[in-house]
């Protein structure tokens, strides 16, 4: 019998400001790996996290 997929999945969060400003001198995009519960949050996850390239707290969105 096949095993069911887990409810929690691994997702990647990416900085929204670094992605829009591709020509930064720091040269990078901040990414965080986290887990989310598919049942509780079916839509894409958005969290305020610290970006070391922007040197401030900014919105990070889930990417596929």
UniProtKB/Swiss-Prot annotation:
SUPFAM superfamilies: Zn-binding ribosomal proteins (SSF57829). Keywords: Cyanelle, Plastid, Ribonucleoprotein, Ribosomal protein. This is Large ribosomal subunit protein bL33c. It comes from the Eukaryota. Its main location: plastid. Gene3D superfamilies: Ribosomal protein L33 (2.20.28.120). NCBIfam families: PRK00504.1, PRK00595.1, rpmG_bact. Belongs to the bacterial ribosomal protein bL33 family. GO terms for cellular component: cyanelle; ribonucleoprotein complex; ribosome. It is found in: Plastid, Cyanelle. One of its GO terms (molecular function) is structural constituent of ribosome. Signal peptide: none annotated. HAMAP family: Ribosomal_bL33. GO terms for biological process: translation.
